[in-house]
């Protein structure tokens, strides 16, 4: 598996973590994905996407929410997830490139709720809970 560049980012509610799978130059867009409430970024669909696009012109960034970095087992309220997600996405985006956000399950919900706030041009929702 390709090894990501890992960066810690301070948020209002603790340190989140970016796992950046570098794209080839010139990069065309950034895809930022979050994990679900019951698991981490090692979910099979998230790792498959990161591996499939590694070295392409699409940079993939998997985000670990602060509660996961802290080792907690239960996700906080959606408002707190959103408050942590927004600065993490801004840090993940870096350059002024088209941004696609998404995630697995609860991560997809966070991405949908905050897509306008972060300036996303699209959303990729995996295992989206109804």
Language model features with spans:
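Primarily recognizes the serine-hydrolase "nucleophile elbow" in alpha/beta-hydrolase
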Residues: 85-130
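Serine-hydrolase catalytic machinery in alpha/beta-hydrolase-like enzymes
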Residues: 9-99
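Short, hydrophobic/aromatic-rich segments at coil-to-beta transitions
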Residues: 1-8
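Residue-level detector of functional hotspots within protein domains
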Residues: 4, 51, 109
């Amino acid at each position: 598996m390709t090894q990501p560049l890992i960066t810690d980012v301070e948020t209002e509610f603790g340190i989140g973590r970016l796992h950046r799978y570098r794209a080839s130059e010139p990069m065309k867009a950034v895809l930022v994905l979050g994990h679900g409430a019951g698991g981490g970024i090692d979910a099979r669909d998230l790792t498959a996407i990161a591996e499939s696009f590694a070295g392409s012109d699409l940079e993939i960034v998997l985000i670990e929410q602060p509660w996961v970095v802290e080792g907690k087992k239960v996700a906080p309220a959606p408002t707190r997830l959103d408050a942590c997600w927004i600065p993490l996405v801004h840090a993940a985006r870096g350059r002024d490139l088209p941004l696609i956000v998404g995630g697995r399950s609860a991560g997809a919900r966070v991405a949908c709720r905050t897509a306008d706030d972060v300036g996303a041009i699209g959303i990729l929702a995996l295992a989206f809970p109804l």
